[in-house]
Amino acid sequence: MPQIFPMNWFLMSLMIMMILIFMTINFYFFSMKMPNKNMFNLNKKTKYNFKW
């Protein structure tokens, strides 16, 4: 048990760090791409508006 619990804590913290880095990369990427709005409004006849 003492050898398994720090490894689970390490993997859990590493996955949390990976998710946070991925969320920040997506946030900066879409905040840079938002003034164009050509990626999102290709068809203006669609019902659904994809807003980030």
UniProtKB/Swiss-Prot annotation:
Its main location: mitochondrion. It is a single-pass membrane protein. It comes from the Eukaryota. GO terms for cellular component: mitochondrial membrane; proton-transporting ATP synthase complex. One of its GO terms (biological process) is proton transmembrane transport. It is found in: Mitochondrion membrane. The keyword Membrane applies. The chain crosses the membrane at residues 10-30. The keyword Transport applies. Keywords: ATP synthesis, CF(0), Hydrogen ion transport, Ion transport, Membrane, Mitochondrion, Transmembrane, Transmembrane helix, Transport. Belongs to the ATPase protein 8 family. Mitochondrial membrane ATP synthase (F(1)F(0) ATP synthase or Complex V) produces ATP from ADP in the presence of a proton gradient across the membrane which is generated by electron transport complexes of the respiratory chain. F-type ATPases consist of two structural domains, F(1) - containing the extramembraneous catalytic core and F(0) - containing the membrane proton channel, linked together by a central stalk and a peripheral stalk. During catalysis, ATP synthesis in the catalytic domain of F(1) is coupled via a rotary mechanism of the central stalk subunits to proton translocation. F-type ATPases have 2 components, CF(1) - the catalytic core - and CF(0) - the membrane proton channel. This is ATP synthase protein 8. It comes from Rhipicephalus sanguineus. The lineage of its organism: Eukaryota, Metazoa, Ecdysozoa, Arthropoda, Chelicerata.
